[in-house]
Amino acid sequence: MADDSKLKFESWNDPQTVLHTPIFDVVNENKKAPDGKNGTYVKIKAPNWVSAIVTRTQADFCERFVMTAQYRHGVNKVMEEFPCGMVEEGESPLDAILRECEEEIGLDRSKILQITKLYESNPNPAFMDNRMTCYYIEVEGTCRQQQNLDENEFIEVRYHTDSQVESIMKSPDTSVMMKYAWAEYKSRLLNLGGI
């Protein structure tokens, strides 16, 4: 095993929050580099995120993938995505994705047949401290109840075939994390014969 101690930076004072927003904080950290030089490094402290690939099992559903469409301010476009959202304080990733699916797509928990964790990863460890956890959720039938959206959330539920999701994943605006979730789902399906 490699000795990473010669690559580590050491903090020499408490981090200072330089910007606080409703969804993340920007923090300056003063650290000593391995060569002994001091520097200030920027970190974004953000909540953990969750997402889920949700499928419907009923045989007559060709459009079995449940996705959401909503306006994304970062790209100023309506994006189609897998249900996703922030993990609230004190909430587990699993509880968070179940809550988000209830809110966004009207998921009826009694219709869940299977839940599997696909992956957990840091979206950008260069300057972010949060984690993204993605699940696969299989539901029986339509799974629909009433949406329970947050204030200022405008989300439309959409159903897609496998090939339609493939097309969405090829868009340059689709997030890396959504693309990775889809790739992990497809890999498990092809290599393991199922999720």
Model regions and ranges:
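Nudix hydrolase/Nudix homology domain
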Residues: 2-10, 78, 89, 132-134, ...
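Conserved Nudix-box catalytic region and its N-terminal flanking loop in Nudix hydrolases
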Residues: 7, 44, 51-53, 60-99, ...
